[in-house]
UniProtKB/Swiss-Prot annotation:
Pfam family, one: GIDA
Localization: Cytoplasm
Protein name per the record: tRNA uridine 5-carboxymethylaminomethyl modification enzyme MnmG
Residues annotated for NAD(+) binding in this entry: 274-288
Amino acid sequence: MDYPREFDVIVVGGGHAGTEAALAAARIGAKTLLLTHNIETLGQMSCNPSIGGIGKGHLVKEVDALGGAMALATDEAGIQFRILNGSKGPAVRATRAQADRVLYRKAIRSRLENQPGLWIFQQAVDDLMVEGDRVVGAVTQIGLKFRGRTVVLTAGTFLNGLIHVGLQNYSGGRAGDPPATSLGQRLKELQLPQGRLKTGTPPRIDGRTIDYSVLEEQPGDLDPVPVFSFLGNAAMHPRQLPCWITHTNARTHDIIRGGLDRSPMYSGVIEGVGPRYCPSIEDKIHRFADKASHQVFLEPEGLDTHEVYPNGVSTSLPFDVQWDLIHSLPGLENAHILRPGYAIEYDYFDPRALKSTLETKAIGGLYFAGQINGTTGYEEAAAQGLLAGANAALQALDRDTWTPRRDEAYLGVLVDDLVTRGVTEPYRMFTSRAEYRLSLREDNADLRLTEIGRKLGLVDDARWDAFSRKRDAVAAEVERLKSTWVNPRNFPAETAEPLLGKAIEREYSLSDLLKRPAVSYAALMRARNADGSLLAGPGVTDDDILAEQVEIQVKYAGYIARQQDEVQKHLAHEQQRIPADIDYDAVSSLSFEVRQKLKTHRPETIGQAARISGVTPAAISLLLIHLKRLHYGSRKQAA
């Protein structure tokens, strides 16, 4: 039957991409439907019980700055929080949290159920309704037809998913869930370019059978306790737990090598390429044969379970090898395995067939987000989901769509990498992928994106009010530091020397003093003038987050300004549009190879064209000349 209500946006899939997509579309004002095969698994953390990390934490902060759910859900579910790279510069500092799986799922579901304009329906989707070159809806496994102006597909690892344990395999989307075989077949019929990728997960351990006395404890950060959301605070966190560290050894490695002949990866059973930066333990032993041991992090799965996730031993080896492998690890000699590790192969679609909005080029109104685009990780999925859901809603409501630039957000880097370069292995975000990372820090994600989110309709009043107060307070304090001056008379040697290492000889602004490497904002604000008054101003000193933002903006002002100059130089050509119907055969002097690559990728801008492998700067110059001629010719015709 035809479902009696029509929708602006239909989101297929209830994982990290799907939930953010549905929430974003509904926040913008689109009538949104979320279709999931199981309401109980909305927001399920299918693999590791953690959020964030280098590059990934930056994406979570950006999702939060745009009104998304992941950061706040993590603050409500996080059982350990740490700042990675804390001793390094602010560009590469990143937040990471262990999360209670049940609490995280509960936090996400609560937001979905309480979001106005969002309907949830439990049914697996078997087919898409396509009329001409446009999607018009989705069909579920019982033949129920839902019509919508746009569809966001977030199928994760479910498309023709195949689970491997040793040389045994069976169909599945993840352990305990069926695959989306019919939908996978339907997408093949639409002739969208696709491939196979692989990911994996480790066996799970009963924590009661672990000997913690021989392990190294890894507590979270306590002073201060990190938070993920710009609206979050440490009081939201549940009870905190430590993680523990053990190591593989020579016996572990011998056990793994002895089982490689029955590994689906090394016997040719698995065709898909696995994630380079999250390799299986058998891959580590094979690729790093000279390494005597590898760290294994024992991560609690939650407050009300004894289940432990051994991060670092993802494997698809036969269970008897997994058994010996786990019991060879110090502290796990008597461990009980609750679930076997496995690998899963799944279909993905070449993201070069997407526009930068994440809409497919071939089928209007159809958006892809998450692992279906060849990425790996909850954070990458959530970021794509938010963007795809927002753009699906904007298109359905006849509004202009939006994509962040590479200099605006890690989300912009992620999408640009996907649609211009494609993937040959599961894509993971790192800070090293961003050429403007000094400007794309975790701490300023809201200052970069919340105003944009407000204009799009993604940011509610509460978030906007909190952001506005922060923005104004930081700006006022930075200005105060620039306009407040000290000199040898009102800032005497007995005050200056402990702070600066020597007395001052001339007049300086407080901003000048803060730019010195050894001077912190907190120390400067504790210093006193000759009359005994503090240098501190009102409203910022007692707020660690505001104080950090002020210090970074002042200390790195010169570097950030230089980076912004560089951005402006590149921006003109970066954003220059290429007509969708351009005839590359008419561009004189292009090589055959470049012509073919441009025809295949159909870049939307000069910037995208320049990042296609094999497209040279000389070819870009020829393309610019051709576009100039087209523009001149069209103006001449109009006259």
